[in-house]
């Protein structure tokens, strides 16, 4: 080996030694981000995702090249812990919401205290593997000898910073541009956060989310342009045009009793296990009612509160976080408000903490005169997260009798809440081979709630309270998280499941019962929680001005739009997180046509219209003009 070669080798080794902490940080964070990606998407390991992940870490690393090694080692150690905690939070959030946590969602973190059992059940011991390197790094840091390379002057540090930053930014820009070219509105709308994370990596996602949050806050502090306001007004006017004749005014003057059932998912209806009906009472009442068997939930970060929000306002959930929390200062043209204009009394019933999901604020905002919350009930029996559905419905019935007619009463149940671990409270129900599984526990929980709902509805009928009342009952959201999809597929005898098999099971039951069991039958129209208020507005002869949904009884449209950008028109189903279309009848993949592409862009526009309405409190402005 000649002297020149030896010189360059020594120089290379010195540079490696001088930057060993940066190299080690890059490798550790890369492994962690890739492991997270594998957890949210089994097909995550593909060549394209390496580039944005490495680039995002290079951008982080570049800033630390300006510091002395002794100082930056400590800073990198702290950053490693911070990123690890973010990844752990992300994966726990994903297990329940099937989404990536955002800055807006973090604002709702205090709400998790009310469902601590749910959160704890989502934590896996393996999650702490994200922190395992910390254990080994502490002793290594103590023994690590810092290099005092006096030759490394400030100018060289700046050059290294610029070079590392430019390489990272160049690679990152290419990756982000490729995504924006494939789906032009994805980055600005964040409509499908899982797919975006899959394409550009977790660090990039959170950086873009933070940027969007800040820029949106700044943008929303200014008034929306007159042109944009007019565009939204024109859409609302067209969407709410109606020449409805089917059941128009059929419920006018009648009481409305609306029941939102916790985690009531559609697959349990008319289903048996070991020869026993899972929901015998709901099955019986469905046969006496108008039943909608293709009714989808569309909740996002607000979960149960989103179901309430859509059903009472026909506006989409917040882009991020919960509308009940983020937009409690807005004005609404809610179902309760419009019924009050017709001299209805309005009351909401839910036995959980009044402040949970900000209900104590949002119920009055939406026009409810009374809110019977936790402190309005005698907590004499607990099942699940709080007061049992049995006691809740019995006490609610007594309160209903005191309301001046006509009234709108909105009841939200609780006992069948995830993680369905109160099997003793649920009582005996033989689930056979599913004993001890999450699905088995859920079947016990929903069977219990079904029994209480049956008793409640039977009492309403027996006491002739249904003679002048419309009853609406629907499920709020999914029961089986995607982490447990194999249990659901096994129960439904589905082999080689596709993404379409998953999405077609994201339906919830919804039925409308009329006095004397009138208008009973099955409506197969593809519909959703966004469509409930417009449908009831037609039946109760209420004004329709600010609704983004459709009247199911007077529409042949199968439009259902989900917050993540997925949609169906009743014929095709677009799954946004894989950018794939399926034929609804056959379940087979189909190619994107120009018509489907145009629909996708239009539906994303409608989501953005809803966001603008909420962000700029437009209903207040529209009503004032």
Give the label of every model feature segment.
Residues 12, 30, 112, 119, ...:
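Generic structural signal of hydrophobic/aromatic residues within well-ordered alpha-helices
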